[in-house]
Amino acid sequence: MVDTDPNSDLRESSVSRRRFMAAAGATGAAMGIAGCTGGDDDDGTTTIQLSADADFEAIEDEIEAALYDAGLSEDIELEVLPGDFETDSRREDYQAALDANRGDPDIFMMDSGWTIPFILREQVLNLEEQLSDDVLSRIENEYLEASVDTATHPETGELFGVPFFPDYPVMQYRKDLVEEAGYDPEGENWATEPMSWEEWAEMVADVWDYHGGEDEYTYGFTTQAAAYEGLACCTFNETMSSFGGAFFGGRENLFERGDRPVTVTEEPVIETIRMMRAFMYGDEDEEAHPDFPQITNDDLVQYTEEDAREPFTNGNAIFHRNWPYSVVINGEEDAFGEDLGTMPLPYGVSPGDSQYDGLGGTQHALGGWHLTVNPNSQNLDAAIEVVEAFVDDDVMLTVFELNGNLPPVPEVVEAADPDELGPIGRYLDTLAVAGEHTIPRPVTDVWPQQAAQVYQEVHDAYTQEKTPEEAMEDLQEQLETSDQD
């Protein structure tokens, strides 16, 4: 609701702070990777530089304390260099640093979607001979297998990164507004039982209309639909998968290229685009899916994560798709507190109705980040000690509580006391469902190129530059070519 929310000033403050940190991250990445040097200090301590999200700079002291409690030598200090908030830009920064054989930062926080190309180029340290047997065994046996797969060499199976946290989104909503409109989220088990996209959209439209529609709330729903990696890997991938569609004919073809079908012109993929066009343009768009109402507008085609979060946090949207970090922000008492609800993402078709195994039903993009070690570091032993300390349960829980980043070991969350986790503890049931229904991106050495092809063509369809069929026919040709290069 515009300018009438009593908490708007508080929320604006939160947004401004995070925006400042993100902007600082872009500058900090360039400065840190290009010139800041760690190493041995005059007092005998060794400073290990970790390039990570800007958020981690704000909680650096708490993380360092947890690392010491986990056994990290107190002669080692951690310095967080805030990386660019946009994953594509961060990849380019890391590529430049490693191409130049720079020794800093010592540790990179790398997106699981583009770690493998760095592994194949032998630009990050092979950890098989560096980590202790106990740590290697834990990663192999207890960590999420899908996360570990994106941190290992696809041919040799050797480990080159330690999963820092997996990421999978949830649907957030204003529970107070939904209940005022006559719905019963708790009685209907919204937190754990997914709706169909059609049922969900009709409900969103009804709640939005009940509260005055666009005159009172700019959006019924916000998500990420800008032309960037997040559209290809995540919002489009998960929605397409929930309709039973796929880039390359199913899950078995995600990680090996060259001899797999390209299937983006199939009907479930087209239906996904038509639904999104209905959400943004309504029945004024002749390509919009007739079974879905308008619940937002085309501002979405400019939105990445923070762009989509801000209207929701500021009280101008009712539903919002995003990663767990934003649940922490929106669940704070100076935001929505217990008026924030979460639910699994809706589904397009039931699992049994997809021609591909494991598709259909609720699907959540599997994101996440790994810790990789710079092989040019002058402090390799200390860097390895830091990475090993991050494998500790209490370190994982500290990061989870303070920043909403999920532990890579499911049992750590299951054993945690929700009351000790802050706002995120209220939403573990939804996160558990999301974690059981994830879809990875098709990560191969050519995925960075293919991701750009995907998000540009999907974006052209979302912005009405092309029909869904035209965009997917063009994408089909591009993916077939790049898969053979």
Please name every model-derived segment:
Residues 98-110, 122-125, 217, 314-322, ...:
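Alpha-to-beta junction loops
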Residues 2-16, 21-123, 133-141, 398, ...:
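Conserved N-terminal structural module of periplasmic/extracytoplasmic solute-binding proteins
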Residues 113-170, 232, 353-356, 420:
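Hinge/lid segment of periplasmic solute-binding proteins
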Residues 59-68, 234-235, 270-378:
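Extracytoplasmic/periplasmic substrate-binding proteins
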Residues 149, 153-237, 245-292, 375-381, ...:
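Helix-loop-helix "hinge/cap" segment bordering the ligand-binding cleft or interdomain interface
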Residues 51, 154, 405-412, 425-480:
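C-terminal capping/gating helix-and-loop segments adjacent to ligand/active sites or protein-protein/ligand interfaces
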Residues 128-143, 188-193, 245-271, 333-334, ...:
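Short, solvent-exposed loop/beta-turn-alpha elements that line the ligand-binding surface or hinge
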Residues 59-60, 214, 387-410:
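Periplasmic-binding protein-like
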